[in-house]
């Protein structure tokens, strides 16, 4: 039981590493409409973060690199995205300061894709932790329009006195705007005991501006746990609810300065409660 309680937060680190302090999926600087987002510089108080994007010759994202600190925490994270000749994601390799601190060099996630339906069906990654081994398998569900509506995560744990077979441990649910162009609600349900029922643990509700999000990768954004990159527009407000610990609830309000292409050039995000302000500058080339 204690090992499971250790593993679940670690799975969360892998799935959502660095997202807490970074405004995923925004863009900026003076640019033309066809330029790519390559860098976001953000600053909150004395903390600063650099987020970089890299692309292949077909302008498909193949790497995301984060450097910086937040409240003394190293946010270093490097996500390499491997694609086949058709552009389908086959695997990712993630290295992060948080993983290194847990004794893990890297995490390789493999993706299964159905050519018959043109959809990603599942993904899996393994963790080798001293004393036991963990396998996380995710299964994706779609709506009639081909949008991912949920991913269910099954954990199998070896090395326990009684090995734990695959059990449903976490489900992320995705709700879209009426137009289908933005993710307006993302919620998480998790089991608190091995094999127990899922119950709500957190949720994020978004409203948007009417301007263009410069980096849009649609369903791939859900696969990569970078849901802000799904949206056609930029978030104007995010309400984050922590069901397990309501004292950690907060709201982010965003204001933007836009470039000639109608994309963000800079932004200010204000957190309530607390009043912390994150100033960001966005660059294309």
What are these regions (language model features)?
Residues 19-285:
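Buried hydrophobic residues that stabilize the cores of well-folded domains
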Residues 1-4, 20:
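Positively charged n-region of N-terminal signal peptides that target proteins for export
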Residues 14-17:
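C-terminal motif of bacterial Sec signal peptides marking the signal peptidase cleavage site
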Residues 5-9:
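Sec-dependent signal peptide hydrophobic core
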């Amino acid at each position: 039981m204690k090992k499971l309680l250790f593993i679940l937060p670690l799975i969360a680190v892998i799935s959502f590493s660095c997202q807490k302090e970074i405004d995923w999926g925004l863009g900026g600087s003076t640019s033309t409409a066809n330029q790519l987002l390559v860098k976001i510089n953000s600053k909150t108080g004395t903390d600063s973060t650099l987020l970089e994007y890299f692309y292949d010759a077909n302008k498909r994202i193949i790497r995301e690199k984060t450097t910086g600190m937040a409240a003394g925490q190293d946010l270093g994270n490097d996500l390499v995205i491997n694609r086949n000749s058709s552009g389908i994601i086959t695997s990712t390799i993630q290295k992060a300061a948080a993983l290194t601190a847990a004794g893990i060099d890297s995490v390789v996630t493999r993706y299964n894709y159905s050519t018959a339906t043109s959809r990603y069906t599942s993904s899996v990654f393994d963790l080798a932790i001293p004393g036991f081994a963990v396998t996380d398998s995710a299964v994706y569900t779609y709506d009639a329009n081909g949008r991912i509506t949920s991913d269910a995560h099954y954990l199998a744990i070896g090395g326990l006195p009684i090995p734990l077979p695959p059990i449903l441990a976490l489900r992320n649910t995705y709700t879209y705007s009426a137009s289908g162009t933005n993710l307006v609600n993302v919620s998480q349900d998790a089991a608190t005991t091995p094999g127990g029922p899922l119950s709500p643990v957190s949720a994020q509700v978004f409203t948007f501006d009417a301007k263009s999000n410069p980096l849009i990768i649609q369903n791939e954004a859900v696969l990569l746990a970078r849901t802000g990159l799904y949206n056609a527009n930029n978030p104007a407000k995010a309400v984050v609810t922590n069901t397990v610990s309501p004292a950690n609830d907060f709201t982010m309000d965003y204001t933007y300065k836009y470039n000639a292409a109608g994309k963000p050039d800079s932004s200010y995000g204000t957190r309530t409660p607390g009043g912390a302000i994150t100033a960001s500058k966005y660059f294309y080339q």
